[in-house]
Amino acid sequence: GAQTIGISLALTIPETLEEKELQELMRGIDDTCRELSIQISGGHTEISSRVTVPVISVTAFGYLKQKRVYESPSKEYDIIMSKFAAVEGTAILLETESEKLQKTYTQSFLSGAAECAEHLSVRKEAAIAVESGVYAMHDLHQGGIFGALWELSRQIGVGLNVDLKKIPILQETVEICECLGVNPYQLISGGALLM
């Protein structure tokens, strides 16, 4: 629920990365930070033979408008999820498994699925949630919706009763995951938020 004001980056890049690719990567980071009004306060870059793709570590810092202290919940609460499960994972699969997917689906279908990756920030819904006084928030990243539900239940110290049919998931995600034999409920789900 904090307002991010700055980040520090640590990049580890492979020896084979071209300067043009590094410039493109940094331009993307800079554009995203400008769009979100976040300052890049510093960082570190190193070249390593131990990585094959760029590894980016981000440390964010910010502030809370007011201190909020909650005790463990004494009553039942509803869990609300923003956006859709597995959107980030779907975008990754579209990139890494493009040849296989192009043999099965039309370019129109794949382009439609790729458009969802443009909405991976949870900043707006997190700000609304804080203003609304939500009890807890958890982003759906590693481990997908299943991992996030487990972590949320541990965070607030209660068990959960979840109806899988009510978890929002795009049809494109379902079909792509089915084609590749991937469980969409365990797929990386950046861009969605549990509240």
Walk through the language-model features, giving the residues of each:
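Helix-biased detector of long, well-ordered alpha-helical tracts
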Residues: A2-L194
